[in-house]
């Protein structure tokens, strides 16, 4: 520490290197106003000891307004203390001085690109991982031994087709990529012509580290809470008070998300698992940190005309640097549903862009409100000319059918049954599956609708995302009987008419779900989610380390079904206009007078012509 670094340029101590990168961040990553606000915020809250101004853990937590109920303060302080030492991990944990805290804000708000050449998201996520991890080669070696044993046990009867938690097992050359692990550090040192510092110990191998499960759980709870936050919105206004019920809700969702990392069988999260799960299922998990730490760059009600030490300065009316937020802003979620609430909405924003979700969702259909029928679904959803989110919740069906309807479902499916993704004795028997459908809903003819942005996902009891593949384009269907399969779903191709007729002429046709698919029957009573690890359908199989090689099929009884429209008031207004037009047309048809003088006879003639249906409602608008 403090030793000179050999280089052609004048030698710089480690302290000088740290100071230099902080100065460059200050000069190139912030506007003068932002830097002024940061200076003011730091001075206003800093403690002083031996002439050193710094921020304590208590100060940081109080400024960010971190809720005590989540117990996440120590985790955020650990992250800041590590990032404050950037680009010198050997100096961590750092005291949060002015320069250290400036580096923390620069990195967590992703403003370092103006100084460093390396700007990739994966590189940024690696620094986030480092800031959360503990380094213990003994723990890592123990993990690797367990994974190797698992791989041997699984490979014995099956050859080399599966590696269990292979994403965590060290593959060839993994230990040889240490330079790549430190790309952001290297970029920082290279920007100061101090690359030799890397050779003198400024490197840390992420493969000898692990994020403790408890710390990660607390952080995910906070990320669920702050997902909708704006840079100028305080956490106290976003969540003025955390009830016990809301805290329990956050903990439940955080545990679901952590199950994606396989923490049930591990003491923590390794880098390879972290990188795999984040990149495939939770790409926007850490987005909330950006606006949270941008709070350092906004000083409210600060009078720029006044300066310290200038008592002669005339008193002027205070002018805020940032205009105060609107008193009545659009709510994040206008009204919660039976499935969708603020916490589930935040979970969705971890893989769907929050700008399409927060303050943008409109409830279109609820089975328990509008009725569990294809007709009600069609009436409420089909006129929405923007993307939609379908959510279905239900309980696992018993292995042996207990009712006629359950038996009919079993008879409809192929005789070979894959195991469910959960065991019958699991504490959580409830599933939540869903889909993001970018296209407008319509009745399916000869082919499915939708495009490559269509996404299948699972929100409980684990978190998983199944993106569209290019192998097949059978994304979404809505089919009424006698079309096969009758119902709605995603990922299963529509059979040709000839195949459908020939198979159904003498007996009920067998429904063969796609390799990765979700199907709801036409009574909206049962749902089936199928996952075949080999893939080959319209959606890619799971990439989660714990389940990527597994086949399963979840059959469950639907308890709640919801569809939410993504879009603003303009889309909702278009839907209202369409509904009003259809009502007027239906009423006009009901009032048609054919001149017979007999109103009942008129209706019978209209029914025979197919213009109105037997329940006296208007006919279909096509």
Curated annotation (Swiss-Prot):
Q: Which UniProt keywords apply?
A: Cytoplasm
TLDc domain: which residues? Answer: 338-567
Q: Spans of biased composition, class Basic and acidic residues?
A: 146-155
The taxonomic lineage of its organism, from the top, reads: Eukaryota, Fungi, Dikarya, Ascomycota, Pezizomycotina
One GO biological process from the UniProt record?
Answer: response to oxidative stress
- Please give the chief subcellular localization of this protein: cytoplasm
Q: Where is the composition biased (Acidic residues)?
A: 169-179
Q: Which SMART domains match?
A: TLDc
Which subcellular locations apply to this protein?
A: Cytoplasm
Which cysteines are cross-linked by disulfides? none
Q: Which GO terms describe its cellular component?
A: cytoplasm; nucleus
Cytoplasm in keyword set: yes
Question: Which family is this sequence assigned to?
Answer: Belongs to the RTC5 family.
Coiled-coil positions are none
Return the protein name: Restriction of telomere capping protein 5
Keyword field contains Cytoplasm:
yes
Under PANTHER family, the record lists: NUCLEOLAR PROTEIN 7/ESTROGEN RECEPTOR COACTIVATOR-RELATED, RESTRICTION OF TELOMERE CAPPING PROTEIN 5
Q: What does this protein do?
A: May be involved in a process influencing telomere capping.
């Amino acid at each position: 520490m403090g030793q000179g670094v050999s280089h052609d340029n004048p030698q710089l101590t480690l302290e000088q290197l740290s100071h230099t990168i902080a100065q460059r961040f200050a000069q190139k990553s912030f506007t003068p106003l932002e830097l002024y606000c940061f200076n003011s915020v730091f001075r206003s809250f800093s403690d002083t000891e031996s002439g050193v101004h710094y921020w304590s853990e208590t100060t940081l937590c109080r400024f960010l307004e971190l809720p005590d109920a989540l117990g996440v303060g120590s985790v955020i302080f650990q992250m800041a203390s590590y990032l404050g030492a950037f680009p010198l991990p050997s100096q961590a944990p750092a005291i949060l001085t002015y320069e250290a805290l400036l580096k923390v804000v620069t990195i967590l708000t992703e403003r370092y690109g103006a100084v460093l050449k390396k700007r990739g998201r994966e590189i940024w996520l690696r620094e986030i991982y480092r800031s959360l991890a503990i380094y213990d080669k003994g723990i890592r070696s123990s993990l690797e031994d367990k994974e190797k044993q698992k791989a041997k046990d699984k490979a014995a009867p099956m050859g080399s087709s599966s590696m269990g938690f292979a994403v965590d097992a060290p593959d060839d050359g993994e230990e040889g990529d240490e330079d790549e692990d430190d790309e952001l550090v290297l970029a920082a040192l290279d920007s100061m012509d101090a690359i030799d510092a890397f050779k003198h110990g400024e490197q840390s191998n992420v493969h000898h580290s692990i994020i403790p499960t408890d710390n990660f759980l607390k952080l995910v709870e906070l990320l669920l809470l702050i997902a909708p936050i704006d840079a100028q919105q305080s956490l106290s206004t976003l969540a003025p008070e955390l009830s016990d019920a809301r805290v329990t809700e956050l903990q439940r969702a955080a545990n679901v998300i952590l199950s994606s990392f396989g923490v049930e069988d591990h003491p923590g999260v390794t880098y390879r698992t972290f990188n795999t799960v984040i990149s495939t299922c939770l790409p926007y998990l850490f987005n909330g940190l950006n606006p949270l730490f941008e709070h350092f760059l906004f000083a409210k009600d600060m009078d720029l005309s006044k300066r310290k030490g200038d008592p002669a300065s005339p008193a002027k009316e205070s002018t805020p640097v940032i205009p105060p937020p609107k008193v009545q802003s659009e709510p994040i979620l206008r009204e919660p549903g039976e499935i969708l609430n603020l916490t589930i909405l935040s979970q969705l924003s971890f893989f769907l862009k929050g700008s399409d979700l927060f303050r943008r969702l409109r409830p279109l259909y609820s089975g328990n409100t509008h009725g569990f029928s294809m007709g009600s679904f069609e009436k409420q959803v089909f006129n929405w000319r923007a993307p939609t989110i379908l959510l279905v919740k239900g309980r696992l069906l018993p292995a042996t059918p207990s009712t006629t309807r359950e038996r009919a479902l079993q008879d409809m499916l192929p005789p070979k049954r894959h195991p469910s993704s959960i065991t019958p004795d699991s504490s959580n028997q409830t599933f939540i599956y869903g889909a993001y459908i970018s296209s407008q809903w319509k009745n399916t003819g000869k082919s499915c609708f939708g495009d490559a942005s269509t996404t299948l996902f699972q929100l409980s009891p684990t978190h998983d995302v199944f993106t569209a593949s290019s192998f097949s384009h059978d994304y979404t269907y809505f089919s009424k009987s006698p079309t096969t399969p009758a119902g709605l779903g995603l990922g299963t191709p529509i059979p040709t008419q000839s195949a459908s007729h020939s198979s159904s002429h003498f007996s009920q046709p067998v429904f063969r779900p796609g390799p990765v698919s979700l199907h709801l029957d036409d009574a909206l009573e049962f749902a089936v989610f199928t996952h075949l690890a080999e893939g080959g359908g319209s959606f890619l199989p799971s990439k989660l380390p714990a389940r990527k090689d597994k086949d399963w099929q979840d059959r469950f009884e639907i308890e709640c079904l919801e569809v939410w429209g993504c879009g603003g008031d303009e889309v909702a207004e278009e839907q209202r206009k369409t509904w009003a037009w259809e009502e007027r047309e239906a009423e006009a048809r009901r009032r048609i007078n054919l001149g017979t003088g007999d109103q009942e006879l008129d209706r019978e003639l209209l029914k025979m012509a197919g213009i109105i249906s037997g329940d006296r409602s208007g006919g279909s608008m096509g």
